[in-house]
Amino acid sequence: MSNIFRGLGVALITPFKSDMSIDFEALERLVNYQLDNGADFLCILATTGETPCLTRSEKDEITRVVKGVVKGRVPLLKYCGGNNTRAVIEEMKSSDWEGIDGILSICPFYNKPSQEGLYQHFKAIAEASPLPLVLYNVPGRTGVNMKAATTCRIAKDFPNIVGIKEASGSLEQVDEIIKNKSEGFEVISGDDALTFPMIASGAVGVISVIGNALPRQFSRMIRLEFEGNYGEARKIHHQFTELYKLLFVDGNPAGVKALLNDMGMIENVLRLPLVPTEVTTKQKMADILKALHVE
C-alpha cells in the first residue's frame, strides 16, 4: 500500500453552539473553507475534534456530514484508537468506513505499555483494519513514546500501515525514522511548529491544528518546501512562530477555536473539561491575525 495523506492535512475541530450541541452548519462552512483554501486531506474525530467528549451517534453524524461535503474531493482520514486493543478492533468492525480513505490510530494512553506492547497492539489492529493505517505517536498525551526502532519494525512487518503522525517533538527521532523506514512508509508532522524542519528532513506533510484557521497560508508554506523554495517557506514559518505558541497556551483546540471565532466562523464554545482560551491570549492572537491581514 502507498500513503495518500500528503501535504496539508487539517485536524478538524468540532464546532459547538452555546447550548453545547454540535453546530453542523458551521462544520459544513469549515469543511468548504478548507477545500477552497488548499487543504490536501482532512482528518476527522481526532484530538482537535474533542472526540473524547462526543457520543458515538455524534461521531457518526459528523462523519456523515463531512463525507457529504467533501464528496471525494480530498482523502479523508478518520480516527479510531484507544488504550483497549480489543475495544479498538470492535469499533473498527462495527463502524461504516464507506467514503473514508484511512484510519488514524494513537499509541495506547495511560496504560504506558512497553515497546513490545506497542508493537503487539498495532499488530492486532493492522491485522483487523479494513483500511490503510496511520499511526499516531504523541507522548505528551499518551505518557509513552514509541521509539523509532519500534515504528520502523511495525512499518516493515505490516504494509497496510502507511505512515505515522509523529508528534514526539524530537527531530532526532524523526530523522531516525526517515533514515531507517521501509519503502512506502512515510512520516507526517503532528506538530505545526515543527512542520517546516520536518518536511526539510523528509516528512511528507502535516496533520495540522493551525490549518483550521489558516489553510491557505500554511499549505503555501508546505508547497514551497516541496518545490525546494525553502527561503520563501521559511518566511511564512517565521510569521507563525508566536502563533504556534499561543495556540496551545490554554490547551488544544481552545486556541484555534478562538482564532476561528475572531474570523466569524464559529462560536467560541468547548465542552468540559476544556474551556475557552484566556481573553489576553485571544487578543494576542487576534493582533497577529490582523498583522497577517487575515479577517
Question: What do these predicted regions represent?
Answer:
Residues 137-138, 160-161, 271-272:
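Glycine-rich phosphate-binding "P-loop"
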Residues 127-128, 141-248:
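Catalytic alpha/beta core domains of metabolic enzymes, predominantly
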Residues 27, 59, 63, 88, ...:
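A general structural signal for well-ordered alpha-helical segments in protein cores
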Residues 2-143, 153:
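Active-site beta->alpha loop and helix N-cap motifs at the rims of alpha/beta catalytic domains
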Residues 24, 28-31, 148, 282-289:
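Short, amphipathic alpha-helical "lid/cap" segments that border enzyme active or binding sites
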Residues 54-57, 90, 115-118, 146-148, ...:
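Short secondary-structure transition/capping segments
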Residues 7-15, 37-39, 203, 207-295:
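C-terminal alpha-helical cap/extension of soluble enzyme domains
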